[in-house]
Amino acid sequence: VNNLFFLNKPIYHHLLHEDFTSSSLSMYKKPEKLFGYRKALKEADNFLESYYGKNNLRDELGHAYTVYTIIQLIRLCGQLTKYNYERIYSFIENFIDNSAVKTNLKFYQPAKGDSKIIPILIKLKLIKFLIYFCNYKATQRYNKK
């Protein structure tokens, strides 16, 4: 090991809530707030590159980007109603057209239980199917009683 870093405080804390609304109230009003991980992962990439040059974690960062994208799309679509459908549709349409989304999809390596369908729907830009499938997944995940 040439360099070693010790951080005396957590740099990231992830808490899995029991329902999708707990991460933010009315997420559909400002859905971009759900996707703040994009900046965090970019900063991690920049940090690693500044110390190691082109880092070997590009695949892992791309995979993480896609995993968090899937999680947040499911949370967002879990709040789908006839009143917010157009806003969610418009956001997702613009979001999946982003070059970072397209680039990072190729690094996604789903483990057992991870979504294989959502990345395909993103690649094919099948927005309606993506919205309804994510809504279905949110119902499965968060409406267990």
What are these regions (language model features)?
Residues 4-40:
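Nucleotide-sugar-dependent glycosyltransferase catalytic core
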Residues 16, 56-60, 83:
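Short acidic alpha-helical/loop segments enriched in Asp/Glu that coordinate divalent cations
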Residues 18, 48-52, 75-80:
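Secondary-structure edge/capping motif, primarily at the C-terminal ends of alpha-helices
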Residues 35-59, 102:
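C-terminal, non-catalytic tails of nucleotide-sugar-dependent glycosyltransferases
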Residues 39, 43, 68, 87-91:
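Alpha-helical elements of Rossmann-like donor-binding domains used by nucleotide-donor carbohydrate transfer enzymes
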Residues 55-74:
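Amphipathic alpha-helical protein-interaction segments enriched in hydrophobic
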Residues 77-145:
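Membrane-interface aromatic/basic loop that binds lipid-linked glycans or pyrophosphate carriers
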